[in-house]
Amino acid sequence: MAPAAGPRTGKHAKPPRSKTLKRKRGQDELSSLIQRVEDLDLKETFKSFSDLPLSEPTASGLASSHYKTLTDIQSRAISHALKGRDVLGAAKTGSGKTLAFLVPVLENLYRKQWAEHDGLGALILSPTRELAIQIFEVLRKIGRYHTFSAGLVIGGKSLKEEQERLGRMNILVCTPGRMLQHLDQTALFDTYNLQMLVLDEADRILDLGFQQTVDAIIGHLPKERQTLLFSATQTKKVSDLARLSLQDPEYVAVHETASSATPSKLQQHYVITPLPQKLDILWSFIRSNLKSKTMVFLSSGKQVRFVYESFRHLQPGIPLMHLHGRQKQGGRLDIVTRFSQSKHCVLFSTDVAARGLDFPAVDWVIQLDCPEDADTYIHRVGRTARYEREGRAVLFLDPSEEEGMLKRLEQKKVPIEKINIKANKQQSIKDQLQNMCFKDPELKYLGQKAFISYVKSVYIQKDKEIFKLKELKLDEFAASLGLPGAPRIKFIKGDDTKQRKNAPRAAAHLLSDDDDSDEEDGEKKSKKKEEPQVRTKYDRMFERRNQDVLAEHYSKLINDDGTMVAPNAGAGADADEDDDFLSVKRRFDAGDKDLGSSSDEDDESEKGDKKDVKVVHIDGSTPLVIDSKRREKLLKSKKKLLKFKGKGTKLVYDDEGNPHELYELEDEEQFKARGDAKDQQAKFLAEEVERTRMADMEDKEIAKQKRREKKEKRKARERELLAEAEEEETLVQLPPYEGDQDVDGGFSASEDEAPRPSKKPKVKFTEANDREEAEPWYKKSKKPSDKAANAPPQVQTLEDLESLATGLLG
């Protein structure tokens, strides 16, 4: 029988009431903690984490991570968040906002005794993947002694693996896009019990870029929750706060009364740089600061790739990296890690690295392109001068951007000074870029995309007081990128649309074959807006317009006021009159003298009735005159348009990278400047004689070398033949037996004195195929003939000789 169940006895037995006492002690500590939080005075100033009512796991995690002193934003925001109030936190970059919301998240869930089966308790949204990873790493450090399960949900990872684990998470750090994907697709993931919602860089998340995504996420969340919003440039819009269902939020802005919105130890400067000189000045700056850590911000990923690839080919003498949103998540994380660990490096980046990321010891922040607003500028320069450290920032401004941008920065309390670039320090890389684009088509393609993306980024900006596209020198900017010409951009049309719309009918018909009149153009545009995306063949049939001779003839018959032009009436005749609708142009009687002839007036009228001629200017010197349908078809054939285009010019580059034409001819003045014609002739002849003599010496040396090689080959062949002949002579052959034996049956003295071969003779073997070919096609008899029996044996080796001697002696 099995032993009776009973209490454990022995050395390792626990006291019977140990678990009960431990549970009671934990409940007492929890009750004491809740009471301390309720008694917390919000007006009190806290200087260290030990002054706050924190749980033992949180306090131990902060101490292990060496967090002791509170910053201003942490001192004021944590106390309000511990009370369960909604908080809007605003502070300068690098002031410790991450801990200001992570500590309340851990404490509030701990006081509610949150467990794995309770579901998701806190959701932390971040605008970028890199910032989400950074928040998650800090959460792991300070929450190492808690029993909560935390997860990181960002794009670029396996969705299936995240779905399997998502239902067991208590705290999630995520980006909006991937979070919405899980809310829509993951069946076991539910947020009905959510307690806290945190938005880091809240103004960016609530911006238009994430508007639909964030609205959809909020629709899945319960309204009864605590919400924390933190950013260096906090939003106060009523619409944004209403979307989040905030309840009496506490606005905590510790630096609102400060004289500057940026860190005090940050030195900020700007440089007036024309657009075509930006890359030259950036290259000169990098070459002058090889022992520093620099971040360079550009407006688009295409620009980042082009500047990185071109500077990488030029080899400035410092490691280069690039970061943009089109890279895969593994590569982005690797670049962020490498840049954080580097001491001397340059990182070209878009605004994906402008918010929240903590890169240690960044010396310079360069903004090559003007930021879209003052808030973006503040976040960019916030990558340096963090945690009371020093830093420097430089902003590149085009002359057209200076006035508007300085006004916006002044409104945000950003102190900035103007500096000038020393001319002797500036280096031009225009020729090198042109040479690289000429040799590398991929780099040229990147340059074209970089140009287009920059122009588009300027075009879509809202603040037209800063961004004035028409004042930018785009052709010179394209040349500074190494491009042969400025790429064509579709959306840059200027005032051509308005001019075409207000032009008369005939002029509009000549300018474009697609736009026939003002009214028809307006009707066509309205139809395009109203028509559905899917159009049947019947829709196309009814919308088809006559684009042949009748349409052109009709446009000539119609005046601008909508009246018909009759042959015998003035321009004021009504188009609806039946008498003028059909009329005979001219009548000839039989035998009339004028039959078959035309007067000068008729010729003039026919010339006036002819279609107006269009002239198309192509790149060449000869314009294309379009006076018929056949000539108009030439525009569709590239091969036939070649004769109207000028001949191309080919450029060659010297060793220094300077471009030259393939054939460069001197003019008369340059020829005379070099001296007298006879002197130049004598000099030319002397140079040619010397060049011919040197070439002759080279030819003789080559011929001599060839003769020497030929002689060596011949001698080597002779040596091979001589060696083969010596091997054949070493074969041993004996004369036939003549019975010259002595009485004892041995060999004669002459045989004994015969010289032995100097070396073992070479045995030659024949291939099986050779033996088969040597045999005749008929079978030989197995019985040996008498002649073959009496023939002396063939001796080839020393063994054969010994066997022969044994036979003779025996």
Swiss-Prot record:
Gene3D superfamilies named among the record's database cross-references: P-loop containing nucleotide triphosphate hydrolases
Q: Where is this region: Disordered?
A: 1-28, 494-542, 590-615, 690-810
Where can the motif DEAD box be found?
200-203
Describe the reaction catalysed, as an equation.
ATP + H2O = ADP + phosphate + H(+)
Q: Which GO terms describe its molecular function?
A: ATP binding; ATP hydrolysis activity; identical protein binding; RNA binding; RNA helicase activity
Q: Where in the cell is it found?
A: Nucleus, Nucleolus
Extract the InterPro entries matched here.
DEAD/DEAH_box_helicase_dom, Helicase_ATP-bd, Helicase_C-like, P-loop_NTPase, RNA-helicase_DEAD-box_CS, RNA_helicase_DEAD_Q_motif, SPB4-like_CTE
Short sequence motif named Q motif, residue ranges: 47-75
Q: Where is the Helicase C-terminal domain?
A: 278-437
The organism's place on the tree of life at top rank: Eukaryota
List of residues binding ATP: A91, K92, T93, G94, S95, G96, K97, T98
Cellular component GO terms, alphabetically?
nucleolus; small-subunit processome
Query: Which keywords belong to this entry?
Result: ATP-binding, Helicase, Hydrolase, Nucleotide-binding, Nucleus, Ribosome biogenesis, RNA-binding, rRNA processing
Q: Does the keyword Hydrolase apply?
A: yes
- One Pfam family named in its UniProt record: CTE_SPB4
> What Enzyme Commission number(s) appear in the record?
3.6.4.13
Record domain Helicase ATP-binding: where: 78-252
Q: Which residues cross the membrane?
A: none
Q: Name one GO biological process term.
A: rRNA processing
Residue ranges annotated as compositionally biased, kind Basic residues, are 9-25, 705-714
What is said about its interaction partners and assembly?
A: Interacts with the U3 and U14 snoRNAs. Associates with pre-ribosomal complexes.
Q: What is known of its domains?
A: The Q motif is unique to and characteristic of the DEAD box family of RNA helicases and controls ATP binding and hydrolysis.
| Protein name per UniProt | ATP-dependent RNA helicase dbp4
Gene designation: dbp4
